[in-house]
Amino acid sequence: MTAPRVPALFTDLYELTMLQAYWAEGMTGPAVFDLFARKLPKRNFLLACGLEQVLDYLEAFAVSGQDIDYLRDLGRFRPDFLERLRALRFTGHVYAMAEGTPLFADEPLLTVEAPMPEAQVVETAVLNLLHYPTLVASKGARVMQAAQGRGVVDFGARRAHGVDAAIACARALYIAGYDGTSNVEAGRRYGIPVVGTVAHSYVQAHASEAESFIRFAAEFPGTTLLVDTYDTLDGVRQVIDLAERLGDRFQVSAVRLDSGDLGALAKAARALLDDAGMPQVHIMASGGLDEHAIAALLADGAPIDGFGVGTTVDVVADRPYLDAAYKLVAYDGRDCGKLSPGKLSLPGRKQVFRRHVDGVAAGDTIARHDEQLPGEPLLNCVMQHGRRLPAGRVDTAGARAHAATQLARLPAALRALEPAEPYPVAISPALQAARQALVAAHPKLETP
């Protein structure tokens, strides 16, 4: 299902002032912009995500009459500019890594090639639409690694930074490997399995915990019951007692622990359930979890079968931003690049080649786009003349499958939570020469 259209005026003011200046100066030649991360945010890799939303935005880009009226009222823009803006559409090409592809610092996640005004005005939205999903998917992949094959579901909608963020987060986490989400709209929009249990309020609203368990299990046989409203282990005992007394009239598939010492409580709950002859009842844990908490629980032998993970992942609490940039790398056939210290760009349109040894990623090379080097080219043309190509029509399920395959091909050390030796990313001799030429054109600069 198509997401709501991103407004054309979701842009920074200076994109529009530059656009007026470009048109006034006749600067409408072909431009190439790269979107990339300058460094990894306490991660061994990033996981590309958000491309579908970028392509939706570019295909639908149009400035409405109401938009023009608002801009006119600002008193900043010339009438002829506003009329030209009214007719503006995106007609360029887009090259991108497929969603679910691991990537590393300085590698273009996406390249836009279009007339300068078109390529410039979309900067804000393109960065926004790729930044957060990539950040979340990268965090989610770490959670899945920590879970060691156990199920993980997204519980973070209520504390995500806005409605749109919650929906984008659910999609990104599903691509990263989560099994589902509690967010019903995300499930409807992207075909993600929706899951849910019951809240403490439901238990509290009944005369007793036992009554709430009976009523809910009768309404939803095979459900998961939340057992920590009053006393976690007493709640587990209530489940056991009701199962013994009511038999098939009380069908429960799991109990959920949401507070306290989850490791100790899980061990005690497992012992109670097993002693009662209920090994088939699973234990699910939630409450302030992230990859580190999950790894610690499992390292301690906690018999937890699945996890509900919310706040700390949805807001990416340990690294809530990505040092992403959208930079001009070529204009009108001329290489360009930012040359300030610490932010030296790689000029020109590029390709990234990934080499594998025995099925495991062994190193990447960032090259000029027309080079032919060993390895798998990662940047594919996903949009041409403003229209999506087959490579840009991969749905959420397809992106999830691609992520699973690509993550499995990373070296084990990169998939671990601990910092690993940096993955080798080389720059081809031809691209190095292009960068040297760019620096040489500014003699006060030195190559780092």
Task: List where the protein language model places each region.
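Glycine-rich phosphate/ribose-binding loops and adjacent secondary-structure elements
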Residues: 201-361
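Ordered alpha/beta subdomains of enzyme catalytic regions
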Residues: 1-219, 251, 326-448
